[in-house]
Amino acid sequence: QQVPGZKETKIKVPIAMFGGSGNYAXALYIAAVKXNAV
């Protein structure tokens, strides 16, 4: 089980790097990472 707070943190980091416009790409990236992790 993933901790909700942990998920929020992982999402906020890429957004800070790529800016608000990168939130969609960040979501795809995180989804890919989670899929690979599982």
From Swiss-Prot:
Keywords: ATP synthesis, Hydrogen ion transport, Ion transport, Membrane, Mitochondrion, Mitochondrion inner membrane, Transport. One of its GO terms (biological process) is proton transmembrane transport. The keyword Thylakoid does not apply. One of its GO terms (cellular component) is mitochondrial inner membrane. It is found in: Mitochondrion; Mitochondrion inner membrane. Coiled coil: none annotated. Transmembrane segments: none annotated. The keyword Membrane applies. Belongs to the ATPase delta chain family. Mitochondrial membrane ATP synthase (F(1)F(0) ATP synthase or Complex V) produces ATP from ADP in the presence of a proton gradient across the membrane which is generated by electron transport complexes of the respiratory chain. F-type ATPases consist of two structural domains, F(1) - containing the extramembraneous catalytic core and F(0) - containing the membrane proton channel, linked together by a central stalk and a peripheral stalk. During catalysis, ATP synthesis in the catalytic domain of F(1) is coupled via a rotary mechanism of the central stalk subunits to proton translocation. F-type ATPases have 2 components, CF(1) - the catalytic core - and CF(0) - the membrane proton channel. CF(1) has five subunits: alpha(3), beta(3), gamma(1), delta(1), epsilon(1). CF(0) has three main subunits: a, b and c. This is ATP synthase subunit O, mitochondrial.
